[in-house]
Amino acid sequence: MKKALVSLAALSMVHDAYAADTLPPAGKTWCDPYKNYSCLDSYLGDDFFTRLVNYYRLEWGRDGSPVDPKAPPSRRDYWPATPQTTPPMPFTEWPYGGTTSFGVTRPNSTDSPLMAALGNTTLGQALNENHIQIYGWINAGGNLSNNTVRGGNAPAADLYNPNTVQLDQAVIYFERLPDTVQKDHIDWGFRIAPIYGENYRYTTAYGLWSYQFLNHNSNYGYDLPMAYGEVFIPQIMEGLLVRVGRFITIPDIEAQLAVNNYMYTRSMTYSLDNYSTTGVQTSLAVTKNWILQLGATFGTEAMPWHWNAQIANPFPNPLYPNNTMPKDPGAVPSVTVGVRWTSDSDNDSIYVVADVINQGNWGYNNLQWLGLVYYHKFNDQWHISFETYDVHQNNVLNILNSAALNALNRGGTPFSPQYMPFNGPFGAQCANALVFSCTAESRAALWYLNYRPNPLNNISWRFEWFDDVEGQRTGTKTNYIETGIGWQHWFSPQIEIRPEVSFYRSLNAPAFNGNFNLGIPRDKNIALIGSADIIIHF
């Protein structure tokens, strides 16, 4: 691991020397598509593998792809300025969810070596003509940790097993983007995005291949965190977009897809809140500065077919007093409301959300999320991202109550070990041991400070506080603080490395180096984790 990090660092220091001019592929005459876009196809070559290799070669050391001078404008001319660039950031617009970005999205706009390689084939031409793209990435990494128990890095995110190398995620998108720049016709889009790797642990929805996580605790698994269609109606104000299917929940700085994050690891703030939901999400651009959102879905990490589904209850109790009980009490109709404002300069953006709100009963991950995200750009080098929220669930079983714990162990809850032998939701450690259940709450605040020295590098400092008030989110009733620093270096728009080091401290009780699935208690208050990953886009 150490040798790998040294090698990556050395490679990053020398690679720019090869990017001054684009050299022609073997057997080709001089051609630089960055200066003469019309020669791009000639530069790439004829067969698939030659074109694929040459496209990676073309972009090496660059911070973007060649620009077609005949392409239509990539944004509405009166729209707020684009605050960032990719690379080195994981986004160009300040992130907001549940919709394709308004005013700045054109079809076929993703820079993809695979699509370039397919460009002169019958399949590639058909895909391009229908504005469909196929692309993705492979993300692998490893960590060095003071923890030693399998699963002992948790609740730190993404590095479940300490001192290991892993395939984090292999992802492929099948996608059509609606054209949100134009205002003269209704357009449509879709995305189907299967994922495979260790990170399936963080996207699993109960009822969709969840046996891998809940019944087998598989180290690697597959999921489909995004499968949706959408319609864009530009004639309504500045545009109305309706999305239907399964999609990532709308708030948060981060996302579970590797390419959407500054650092390799995600914050505890993100990893312990909502991930995905299924249903309908509407987003209305009222003006160029204001976006309103309203969604109707079926809970968080829940499937619609679990709504009203019942299972036998072998041990009726005060929480579930009948002979049957809900399979997932969180799989119920839910409402999401969001408001986003951005300044004309796009130096400031604030996003306030009530996410997937329902009765709030203890579910697989039925979090009632209330919070906001704020971004501020100081200049082209510096910006901050800030997020804070409060989440809660009601009627969470109290594991400090002996009668409640007996009901849990004897199959009297939907999340008893008879139904979920691994990774079921935690109960609460209520303030009063005499109550059978209580409301479990958690609060968080997250800060990223980012410095961009040049177009291929970004340095991120992360600081966060997480208060697991009843211990329902992490299994330990404690406050956490975490701070980490990471470097994102891009060799090209297609290849990125992200070394980092993070320090975690549990202030009130040991919270690391244990494994509830294996019956190993946590015995450390501190986790120090160094890690690095690589993302290769295709």
Model-derived features: where do they sit?
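Outer-membrane beta-barrel "beta-signal"
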Residues: 491, 495, 522-538
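Flexible, surface-exposed loop regions and adjacent strand-edge segments
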Residues: 151-155, 206-211, 258-265, 309-318, ...
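Outer membrane beta-barrel
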Residues: 33, 125-146, 150-302, 340-349, ...
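Outer-membrane beta-barrel proteins
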Residues: 145-149, 199-205, 251-256, 303-306, ...
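Residues that define the transmembrane beta-barrel architecture of outer-membrane proteins
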Residues: 130, 161-170, 220-225, 274-278, ...
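Transmembrane beta-strands of outer-membrane beta-barrel proteins
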Residues: 135-143, 191-195, 243-247, 295-297, ...
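N-terminal periplasmic/intermembrane-space "pro-region" immediately following the signal or transit peptide
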Residues: 2-150, 430
